[in-house]
């Protein structure tokens, strides 16, 4: 099957029309730098990409091109292989993902304060449900720096900045490569649930405010597992391709500490 957002049916590639789909030149809102194309005259009119250092600069540029009436195409037959995103454990880079998303929202959308606050709450809520307190603090740090203004983009000491962000992330979320996680309670995999239960999970951050310790163990090999898969009162283990594990343990003390830092 070609992706989850296409209408190409599952089946043998020569019988489903997938070859025609892969070979077409498709129009999109943006493309990653390594396979996008646009007129050179467009650069003269809309200017150069923003100095965002990493992640999201291609998204902003695609949106900017579209706002000037330039189309962005993905030429068929061009691809670059890289490691699956499912096997990548995202730490400090979450800061740049969210900070640059805030910049993009401020530049290209109406009523940006309302949208930005909503996005911040959404990102933090999902991080809490996943017990990923490091991702939460990256979003808060990104928001704080965004509020300081465009001067933050003039920083060039990237090595120091990344080390500081990485230390901050691991202060809240740690990777354990020394052994296997031990928990006597039941181990659960992904299960479908009713929409009302999913809504309750989101609104209460998976019942984080209730002072009950972990009673379940959710395990997956996908580093980008969905917050909707996590059962109530669960510790989480992610098995990495290299044999290491990531443990996201439910921690009410960290939850309360982070909530105090972010008051909206």
Located regions from the model:
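A conserved hydrophobic position in a structured secondary element of the catalytic/binding core
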Residues: 38
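Catalytic-core region of carbohydrate-active enzymes that cleave or remodel glycosidic bonds
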Residues: 48-51, 63, 67-68, 91-111, ...
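Hydrophobic alpha-helical scaffolding
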Residues: 52, 87-94, 126-133
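Terminal low-complexity segments of carbohydrate-biosynthetic enzymes
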Residues: 99-264
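Active-site donor/metal-binding and catalytic loop motifs
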Residues: 75-91
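A recurrent flexible, glycine/aromatic-enriched loop bordering the glycosyltransferase active site
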Residues: 7-35
């Amino acid at each position: 099957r070609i992706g989850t957002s296409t209408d190409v049916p599952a089946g043998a590639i020569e019988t489903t029309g997938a070859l025609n789909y892969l070979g077409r030149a498709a129009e999109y809102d943006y493309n990653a730098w390594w396979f996008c194309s646009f007129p050179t005259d467009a650069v003269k009119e809309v200017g150069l990409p923003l100095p965002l250092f990493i992640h999201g600069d291609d998204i902003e540029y695609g949106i900017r091109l579209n706002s000037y009436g330039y189309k962005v195409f993905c030429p068929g037959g061009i691809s670059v292989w890289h490691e699956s995103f499912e096997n990548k454990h995202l730490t400090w880079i979450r800061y740049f993902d969210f900070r640059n998303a805030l910049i993009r929202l401020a530049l290209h959308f109406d009523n940006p304060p309302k949208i930005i606050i909503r996005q911040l709450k959404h990102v933090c809520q999902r991080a809490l449900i996943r017990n990923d307190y490091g991702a939460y603090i990256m979003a808060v740090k990104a928001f704080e720096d965004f509020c300081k203004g465009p001067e933050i983009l003039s920083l060039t000491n990237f090595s120091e900045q990344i080390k500081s962000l990485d230390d901050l992330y691991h202060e809240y979320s740690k990777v354990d490569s020394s052994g296997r996680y031990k928990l006597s309670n039941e181990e659960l995999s992904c299960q479908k649930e009713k929409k009302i239960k999913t809504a309750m999970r989101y609104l209460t951050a998976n019942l984080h405010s209730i002072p009950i310790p972990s009673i379940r163990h959710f395990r997956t090999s996908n580093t980008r597992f969905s917050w909707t898969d996590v059962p109530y009162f669960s510790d989480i283990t992610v098995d990495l391709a290299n044999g290491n594990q990531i443990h996201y343990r439910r921690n009410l003390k960290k939850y309360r500490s982070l909530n105090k830092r972010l008051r909206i």
